[in-house]
């Protein structure tokens, strides 16, 4: 006689690890309802509510509310690595809203759906960081991607923004298809969606051709989301076409979430195949370093320069992944966390120097900035020096960490490529510093920015790159704790 299987009842305690995500998604739905009753004149309340929701989620993560564990049969995993990534993701998402408020309001671009989309995109990134199955990876990825497409297209009257959103959507859909196809091959070969189950199935199997093919397709999808060459075609157009606050958001937190996706898929799921995919990741790293730096040199538009420099930074991040092991992943996370802070500050400077009717997005717009605004020039100097990897700024220690991980992972050739490209990359960052301090101003001096909140946030953000560079060890220890015991 057949018996019907029964499922254990799901209790409130079982959902405890999911508390930050539940609060965030609940806040997003509440904001969606609130926006219906708030006039355009009073949109500041939707802005403040969205920032408050992210602040509450940040506190929940920082205090460890809900505890660690896995739920839904391992589909959702909350561990130290997930908490580190989520904390930074939520912090940077909140900063993007703070940076963007005045900019979007002055240009009549601020609509209630923008903070709603940011909250849902943040929820998608948090799901990626905690994914324990292929299904959760795809759910988090699509939630992030669909919100990102809409955010890029938020300036409907701008042809560049519309074109960028269309390219982003088409190429993003293609990348999602590649990723999904790779997942289907892996599922067909292992018979499970669980990443831990896939790991065990691979260890007990001698037939790996189908698994390697699936891994290649998944790596292509991950590379697109990261912006690694040669899957970076969407980056320059999106960074240039999107409003600066949207470009800030897309350039920062999603990179950390994509790193989390790479870790879950490749190390947790496809770990037994690491000797094969480490070489592929190393190749992507080298190509990204070379292409990103060479293309960035030729740019006169600062947003496009930052887009190509992102490609090179992703190359350094992948260097840590290619190194593998506890040290490699800790170095890669250290780089990802630090880069999100640096990228936020770089686009924050563009926002702070822009005015309604004028976008400070060309390098020539920074000419003579020291003569007009020495404080702002000093902040931009800190940002560019950190991105270039000049000591004692934070960017120097991040590059040193991933280079060390590559050497320890027997990838000396990749470390040498990284050193050469780091020297090349310093050129275009130093060019921005040069025009600020040694070139004559172009045009009339810009009016002073009276937004004290924006100025304060940018000041703290930029000076943090110096402060954290002088005291980088706690961040590195934080990242090492996330991967303690990883072989």
From Swiss-Prot:
The chain crosses the membrane at residues 18-38, 44-64, 84-104, 116-136, 169-189, 211-231, 242-262, 277-297, 305-325, 333-353, 377-397, 410-430, 457-477. InterPro entries: NADH-Q_OxRdtase_suN/2 (IPR010096), ND/Mrp_TM (IPR001750). The keyword Membrane applies. Its EC number is 7.1.1.-. GO terms for molecular function: NADH dehydrogenase (ubiquinone) activity; NADH:ubiquinone reductase (non-electrogenic) activity; quinone binding. Pfam families: Proton_antipo_M. It catalyses: a quinone + NADH + 5 H(+)(in) = a quinol + NAD(+) + 4 H(+)(out). Keywords: Cell inner membrane, Cell membrane, Membrane, NAD, Quinone, Translocase, Transmembrane, Transmembrane helix, Transport, Ubiquinone. It is found in: Cell inner membrane. It is a multi-pass membrane protein. The keyword Translocase applies. GO terms for cellular component: plasma membrane. One of its GO terms (biological process) is ATP synthesis coupled electron transport. Its main location: membrane. NDH-1 is composed of 14 different subunits. Subunits NuoA, H, J, K, L, M, N constitute the membrane sector of the complex. NDH-1 shuttles electrons from NADH, via FMN and iron-sulfur (Fe-S) centers, to quinones in the respiratory chain. The immediate electron acceptor for the enzyme in this species is believed to be ubiquinone. Couples the redox reaction to proton translocation (for every two electrons transferred, four hydrogen ions are translocated across the cytoplasmic membrane), and thus conserves the redox energy in a proton gradient. Belongs to the complex I subunit 2 family. This is NADH-quinone oxidoreductase subunit N. The gene is nuoN.
